[in-house]
């Protein structure tokens, strides 16, 4: 539980500092009015931040995706997000940890958006449906941050925390550190998930932007499972931690 507390405090501090900074500056609407921006225009974007193949210590090759698309105006947008993996070999073979979210997003400050909607999980066992509430935006030092809370009609709760940063080494070469943590309020034996901090992924990727919308990359990913989740994985013959090499594409339209 100490690890859970540290993670929550860390992400809360980042988000809180970002909101405080935003509160001391001009609001998004005031900025748009001052610059005479057309805030009624509608536009959209689709992005796969991570579309990759991984191979690690366990010898289990896997395809992984993390993408999102949105459409709307300056203040309100409709978002679709999805992430997951397909394991090609080993005890975990098949679709794993896959989900799709449909969200309404509203600007609440210069740097932050409130997002409300639902999430549908896919994969082995019973599918789960969640209601989601979260924030997404830029923390100090331009860290892209997401913090989302989930609740299901079965009384289950969960949280997902994400942070990433793009460091420009040159005009085309970009280094991107990334971290994601998943937490659950109750154990779920059917899905091999323990309560508390379930898993933590920390990675770093180096991409080369042939064009801004098309960038191949290589990376290293460290994945660690904790508590009951680690016990479930070990009991099934897997490893609680793994280091993987990643090769993939970042593409957007």
Locations of regions flagged by a protein language model:
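Outer-membrane beta-barrel initiation region
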Residues: 20-93, 105-106, 245
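Residues that define the transmembrane beta-barrel architecture of outer-membrane proteins
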Residues: 42-44, 61-65, 94-100, 127-131, ...
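Transmembrane beta-barrel strands of outer-membrane/channel proteins
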Residues: 50, 80-84, 116-120, 147-151, ...
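Residue-level signature of outer-membrane beta-barrel architecture
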Residues: 71-73, 106, 137, 151, ...
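Repeated loop/turn-to-beta-strand initiation elements of outer-membrane beta-barrel proteins
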Residues: 75-80, 110-114, 141-145, 170-175, ...
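Extracellular loop and loop/strand-boundary signature of outer-membrane beta-barrel proteins
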Residues: 83-90, 120, 132, 147-149, ...
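Detector for outer-membrane/organellar transmembrane beta-barrel domains
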Residues: 127-189
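Outer-membrane beta-barrel "beta-signal"
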Residues: 204-209, 240-253
